Amino acid sequence: MTPAERRAFERQLQQEFPGLELHAWYRQYRSLKAAHPDAILLYRLGDFYETFDDDAKLVADLLEVTLTYKEFASQKGRDQKQRCPMAGIPYHAVEGYVARLVGAGYRVAIAEQMTETPSSRTDTRPRSIFAAGIEQTALIGGHKMVERKVVRIITPGTIIESGMLPAERNNYLAALIADHGRIGLAYADLSTGEFAAIEFSGERAAQQAQGELARLNPAEILVPDRADLRLPGLEPSSARLEQDLEFLTREERERVLPGERIARRVERENHARWAHGHVTAWSEQRWDLRNARDTLLHQFGVHSLAGFGLADRPLAIRAAGAIVQYARETQQGTVANLRAIRVYTPGDAMVLDPQTQRNLELLEGNSGTTRGSLIGVLDQTRTPMGARLLRRWISQPLCDLARLRARHDAVDHFVNDAILRASVRETLRRVGDMERVVNRIIQGSGVATPRDMARLRDALRALPDLVAALEDWTPPQEDVDLSGMSALQESAALAAAPLDGITPPDDDHTEQEPTTISLRAQREARRRVSARLTGDDLFDEEEEQENAGQPAPLPTTETVRASGESARPSFEMPSLHGHGESPTLDACADILAFLETAIDDDPPALLGASNYLRAGDNGELPRRVIRPGFEPEIDRVVAASRDAQRWISELEPKERERTGIKSLRVDYNRVFGYYIEVPKTYADQVPKHYIRKQTLTTGERYFTDELKRYEEIVEQAQQRLIDLERRAFARICETLAGAGVRLLRTARTIATIDVFAALAEAAVRGRYVRPELYDDTRLRIIGGRHPVVEQTLDETFIPNDIEMDTETRQICLITGPNMSGKSTVLRQVALIALMAQIGSFVPADAAEIGVVDRIFTRIGAQDDIATGRSTFMVEMTETAALLAQSTHRSLIILDEVGRGTSTYDGMAIAQAVIEYIHNEPRLGCRTLFATHYHELTDLERTLPRLKNYHMAATEQDGRVVFLHELRPGGADRSYGIHVAELAGIPQPVIRRATELLAELERRAPRSTPQPAPERTEERPAAGRPTARSHSAARGDPPRAPDGQLSLFDLTPGPVIEMLRRLDINQLTPLEALNKLYELQKLARIGGG
């Protein structure tokens, strides 16, 4: 705090607690809390992270932990204690508890101890997962208060701990900003280093941004905190967000809004599912263009953003700058793994709006899990990073023919070699999540853990087998391009030796001898790299201590203390530049050799948890981070303390023999250290030089000056070893981070190989075929099947053929009974096209597909209660969107358009939609239209590119049998009553419905679309610029006065005709009576 802020803080405490003396720890807690009022503050106290006041009540309720009370102040001049609520969680379980708090929508700030008391034995405990690399410093002088500092702020979009993240999904942080009709969107996954940005413009910008957010499904979204927060076209979710923000103060708007008002409402918004993510409203000043540009230049270590494609995208720059600033703020430092950004455009991939993603059940089934979804079928991956990549491919299919054919070639390679496929998939099981592990290591020892090193080592151990299996095969490289990492590459080029181990993307991996350079030269190289990246000289240039191989010093406290204070790493940091590895997959043999030398076989989970000196106590096995022989200084300190430990271990038998006390015992605990315990019955035999330490009911505990001296040697050695271990670990992280680009390229190549092998496995299991892709608008599927439905059926799935193009078969109008499979056919066609464009084989006997730029679906609907929209309104909104955004290369799937209103209204709208798609010059796209309006089949006579199909059914013994076959021609019946009977409708209702249906069919003439007046305008053929004249049909079906087909709207008879002709105003009472008699007579003889 600044002096002014400190004075204001003190005044606030005096006003809040008049007449109270606050304890020092509580003042410290309130000071930290004041700096982070929007977060739950976890305050480290010994083995627990404690929360106080309102935070404690909230944590106790959410996490179901005990709420207690702790003294925090005393009354001046009185012996009256003041207590506050307190709830704590153990440090070793903090990760799981924090995940629950963040999942509930709260920010969590971690306040860690930064200093230790010299006399405290408990401060050598390991750090938590969130502060693994934080180095404590000893308190000096008379200060008794341990310093604490917030080291991390954890929010839904900034989690980097693997244990808190789903392995198979990315955890995106997104930033969204709109200005003058343009929208900038950036997103990053801090756990993998993925960073990308896009800018939308034009009248479709809002819809495109909404679709991209739906694809990403970010965990957290940053938006500017301002009055015009609403983004046009992103209704209704952003509208509701704006309404909620109006209830908050400006300070509250800057918080991560925790689910109470916003998430509860927006989760009901089915058509904008991204909105259920947590929203953080940031003040508008943080989105300043100049500030954002400077932030990115510094982050990437470059002088211009033109090389990333950002020069002419100001809103993308502002969004990306907000991502980096927010990440730095929450990580409380730099974000080393965001070293490049990928800029892309809306036309790079197939467009899938939120409705299509939901209707086709791409990533989630109806259950909210992957069961019943496309990814549930295709995901045969063996690594978490492969699973994440497959999800990205499914949500962002390609439109580039060359890249698609390369992907199909790769899948074909694995399909045709079962032995290779099995070998690669078995080897991939051993790789794990190398991508996230490498990203944690790149971020340094403050994030990486010893277990991360062990996981990376285990992954690299599998690479030689993978390289050998793949031999000379080269997978497509488009998904592993890291050429944008120019900052790291430029920095590596500055080094005197190839310390950073970065191979530029275009370099040939030529053979070269490993280079070993002196530690001094390596320090100088690192210093210049560090200065270039951060502007700071992080490494000193002191001389290396040339004391390797010297005999261990005598076990004195001075020896141990001196070794710790002057320690410099004496191990040689190797060059991690590539050494002639495979051009396809770098086995990273030199990196593996380095890790094998540096990291012990089974390191503890966290730094500070090693037991270099007390291994064997209570049956504990030796565990250490640094392998013996790697860091001589650690080995010297261990050796220097061995004699002290040996002396202590030999003390018990010596003292028993010298004193004659056979039950004398020498032992240790963390509170009192080493002691000599003597039972009370031998009190008179205790030597005079024994000094009493503790009295027990059964005896006394003592120590001697000599035992105390050796105890200090052991304790100081333990602390020095922890310090040396932390320093050595930081250097190891630093060396590996220098090879970060190389390791990331390897990890992402492995992920790509994993996806190809998985798609091949799915193809073999599902009997899929390779699709043929073309740069036109054909769509020919022979023996097509639904990839998900066929796996859930007990019986054989009935395949179907379909053939479309925009010249002769643009629209397929499908009629047929309920439950006959119309919706399945619609979805399977869309899924087959999508699967082909992610690089997968498809469930068919053969498939020829012209590249689809967008898939639109209008399948099913329900009332949108949250926004007050009826089923029909939802249906019409979605239909309007697809009609406005489709192109001649799109694929439209329409199921039961018009069913949400009256019969004639619905049929009129359905016919008008068909005509618009058929006749509109901008459209003319491939369309599958399923309907129960059988009258629409007559449009085949007047719309030349519309063809009728129906789902076949037959009757056997009075029951309908669905054949699930798509056949040419229109259906003549819907069999709705049969379906009602199958659903369990009572028999009296079924019988009455049958009677009414027969009556309606007998009396009501069939409504048939009538030919429309011939149009005179010229219209190009579908998807072509050439104009031609045509006649379009637009029939106007007969309409009841209320627009609704009625059960009683029958054919008029003589009685009705007579009534219509009567002029009641001109009739006398006698004439009226006579007319009534005539009408009654006509009715009795059946004149209707």
From Swiss-Prot:
Instruction: Give UniProt keywords alphabetically.
Output: ATP-binding, DNA damage, DNA repair, DNA-binding, Nucleotide-binding
The record's section on InterPro entries has: DNA_mismatch_repair_MutS, DNA_mismatch_repair_MutS-lik_N, DNA_mismatch_repair_MutS/MSH, DNA_mismatch_repair_MutS_C, DNA_mismatch_repair_MutS_clamp, DNA_mismatch_repair_MutS_core, DNA_mismatch_repair_MutS_N, DNA_mismatch_repair_MutS_sf
Q: Name one GO molecular function term.
A: mismatched DNA binding
User: CDD domains annotated for this entry?
Assistant: ABC_MutS1
Q: Which domain of life is it from?
A: Bacteria
Q: Name one Pfam family in it.
A: MutS_IV
Instruction: Tell me the PANTHER family matching this sequence.
Output: DNA MISMATCH REPAIR PROTEIN MSH1, MITOCHONDRIAL (PTHR11361:SF34), DNA MISMATCH REPAIR PROTEIN MUTS FAMILY MEMBER (PTHR11361)
* Protein name (database record): DNA mismatch repair protein MutS
Q: What is the scientific name of the source organism?
A: Roseiflexus castenholzii (strain DSM 13941 / HLO8)
Q: What is the lineage of its organism?
A: Bacteria, Bacillati, Chloroflexota, Chloroflexia, Chloroflexales
